[in-house]
């Protein structure tokens, strides 16, 4: 309805792992399948080296009650076998059962970071949207799995937001 229901909140206040660290690149989508807003943002620190992807599910019906919000964090460098990398340029998409988050992966430190590869993280909604459920375990693709048909590394992938019954 366009009416503000909650006062502005700093990103680093949405999840305890964000506190006192650089929180950036927020993305917000409305998941019509579950009547839930999803806020995704990144957290990064050079010392000690840290990279997180934070997702906060906000049920539309109870959005004014921040106690019903469900924050979850994932390692920003979740691709197995990868050197320590930090995530940047997130993209967010969803369908009726999963949320997909894409990022570009850079080397530390951030001031001289070099692009390594794109990362695709797909997560079942159950634990992501309901904090009474066990934390979800994402499926992650990166490295050679995110190359284009010519063998080049993809850059800034964007997952789809599906609408409708299929």
Regions inferred by a protein language model and the residue ranges of each:
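C-terminal PAP-associated
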Residues: 1-166
